[in-house]
Amino acid sequence: MTDIAEITGINKIGLLSLGAYRPERVVTNDEICERIESSDEWIYTRTGIKTRRFAADEETAQTLAIEAGRKAIANALLTGAEIDAVIVATSTHYLQTPASAPAVATALGAQGVPAFDLSAGCAGFGYAVGVAGDMIRGGSASKVLVIGSEKLSPALDMTDRGNCFIFGDGAGAVVVGETAEQGIGPTVWGSDGSQSNAIRQDIDWMDFAAAPDPEGPRPYLRIEGTSVFRWAAFEMGKVGQRAMEAAKVGPEQIDVFVPHQANTRINELLAKNLHLRADAVIANDIEHTGNTSAASVPLAMETLLSTGAAKPGDLALLIGYGAGLSYAAQVVRMPPVPFE
């Protein structure tokens, strides 16, 4: 019998760099309240959000991804030609096909590499980091560009008092590759399809295309806020605990906590339930960025590093959670401070 060659990869991997792109337009709570009966105080008290960014009309999840990816590659002191694979985590690419990642890879000079989109809602970045890590450890790549990119603003019903103020646009990216010490722990991930309706698109694309009434239902994003809050607040702490156990670290060793930026109150409950140190840094990028779905974790990491709140090499617990319902968590070492 002819043997098929065995494949061996790199075991010690980490986040080599980070890149972020935030659209220019800042949207305040007061602007949001021009369309709904609410107030800046009400929104901030319940979500922790003061402002968010909305992308320009000509920008898309794909163009945002290119900008963040370009910065991540530059911050890793690499060229696009040195990237072996590109994964774009997004739920807001305008086309069902083709995926955005091949065009993103080509735009960044990573011509001919495997490139694909990954859709796991707000857990998308964690899923993509997990897949990238497995690719490298499995020997099919050595440097993988992971991008979380979302343009959520067109999917918002700006008259929906329940969620129109939650979301924003943006993109964050990392290069995953070989490091001297282990920089990415095992990924703890999963889903609960019994709650798939908790975060959903109002109407599917085929029904929308066939609808004769231009004033009829549109493919807006809807959230069952109470259900999602309870699920995240009480279940994601268990996921974080499992991620720490898988990485063989304790809560007292975690320097930085970067949960998905969905709601400040959820994140405070998670930090308490995880029994993190009193001086552990907790990401709060949501205050000025809103919920950017798959982009929220890398954007929050960039803010922590750029402001000096976190340092390269700090041990960080990442937890992403959202539509699906889906979740993914890892313990990682924070990458270098981005200069781009």
From Swiss-Prot:
Pathway: Lipid metabolism; fatty acid biosynthesis
Active-site annotation: C122, H260, N291
GO molecular function: 3-oxoacyl-[acyl-carrier-protein] synthase activity; beta-ketoacyl-acyl-carrier-protein synthase III activity
Record's keyword terms, sorted: Acyltransferase, Cytoplasm, Fatty acid biosynthesis, Fatty acid metabolism, Lipid biosynthesis, Lipid metabolism, Multifunctional enzyme, Transferase
Catalysed transformations (reactions): malonyl-[ACP] + acetyl-CoA + H(+) = 3-oxobutanoyl-[ACP] + CO2 + CoA
Compartment annotation: Cytoplasm
Annotated GO biological process: fatty acid biosynthetic process; secondary metabolite biosynthetic process
Domain of life: Bacteria
Family annotation (CDD domains): KAS_III (cd00830)
The keyword Cytoplasm is annotated on this UniProt entry: yes
InterPro entries attached to this UniProt entry: ACP_syn_III_C, ACP_syn_III_N, FabH, Thiolase-like
Pfam families assigned: ACP_syn_III, ACP_syn_III_C
One Gene Ontology term, aspect cellular component: cytoplasm
Segments for region (ACP-binding): 261-265
EC assignment: 2.3.1.180
Similarity comment: Belongs to the thiolase-like superfamily. FabH family.
PANTHER family named among the record's database cross-references: 3-OXOACYL-[ACYL-CARRIER-PROTEIN] SYNTHASE 3, BETA-KETOACYL-[ACYL-CARRIER-PROTEIN] SYNTHASE III
Entry note about domains: The last Arg residue of the ACP-binding site is essential for the weak association between ACP/AcpP and FabH.
Role: Catalyzes the condensation reaction of fatty acid synthesis by the addition to an acyl acceptor of two carbons from malonyl-ACP. Catalyzes the first condensation reaction which initiates fatty acid synthesis and may therefore play a role in governing the total rate of fatty acid production. Possesses both acetoacetyl-ACP synthase and acetyl transacylase activities. Its substrate specificity determines the biosynthesis of branched-chain and/or straight-chain of fatty acids.
Subunit structure: Homodimer.
Name recorded for this polypeptide: Beta-ketoacyl-[acyl-carrier-protein] synthase III
